[in-house]
Regions:
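Short beta-edge/loop segments at beta->alpha junctions of small alpha/beta modules
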Residues: 1-10
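Membrane-targeting and insertion segments and their boundary/processing signals
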Residues: 3, 47-51, 68
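Generic, low-specificity signal for short hydrophobic/alpha-helical stretches with a mild N-terminal bias
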Residues: 7-8, 32, 59, 63, ...
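Short gly/ser-rich loop at a beta-strand->alpha-helix junction or flexible surface loop bordering the NTP-binding
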Residues: 10-52
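A short, charged helix-loop
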Residues: 51-61
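Hydrophobic alpha-helical interaction segments
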Residues: 61-133
Length: 133
C-alpha cells in the first residue's frame, strides 16, 4: 500500500479529516519529484506521528477553517501553494495545476477558496483561467 492510502485509512478509522501538506501536497500534484521520507497531513484530529515501512506519517492539527467545507482537491491545492510560498509560484506551476484539475475541480476551487489568503485565491483564479485583475 502507498503511504497516502495508509494515511487515509488511519484518518477514516479515527474520523479525522486530513489533507496532504508540505512536500506531500507538492508530490501528489506533480509539482515535486523529491521522494519524501515523511508524509505530512493537516488534520482536525490531534498531532500524531506513525512509523510505517521506514516511512513516517505525520498529522498536524489545524483549525477546521483550513479543512472544513473544502473539497479534497481545493484543500490540496491551497496547501501546495502555501508550501511553495507566494514568491515561488511561477507561470509553469500555475499551468501544471491547471492541467491537473478537471473543470469541475476548478469550479469547486473557485467557489471554495474565497476565504483563503488573497495571493492564494488570485493564484487559483489564474489557474482556473479567470481574470487576474
Amino acid at each position: 500500500a502507498d503511504p497516502d492510502a495508509v494515511a487515509k485509512a488511519l484518518a477514516r478509522s479515527y474520523h479525522w479529516t486530513i489533507v496532504p501538506c508540505g512536500n506531500t501536497a507538492l508530490n501528489l500534484l506533480g509539482l515535486s519529484t523529491q521522494v519524501t521520507a515523511v508524509w505530512s497531513y493537516i488534520s482536525d484530529g490531534p498531532y500524531k506521528t506513525y512509523e510505517w515501512n521506514s516511512t513516517k506519517l505525520e498529522f498536524k492539527h489545524r483549525t477546521n477553517k483550513e479543512i472544513t467545507g473544502l473539497s479534497y482537491m481545493t484543500s490540496l491545492v491551497i496547501q501546495a501553494l502555501k508550501t511553495l510560498g507566494r514568491t515561488n509560484v511561477t507561470a509553469e506551476i500555475i499551468q501544471t495545476l491547471s492541467e491537473k484539475l478537471s473543470e469541475d475541480e476548478k469550479q469547486a476551487c473557485l467557489k471554495e477558496a474565497t476565504e483563503s489568503t488573497d495571493w492564494v485565491y488570485d493564484t487559483i483564479r489564474k489557474m482556473c483561467g479567470g481574470d487576474t485583475q
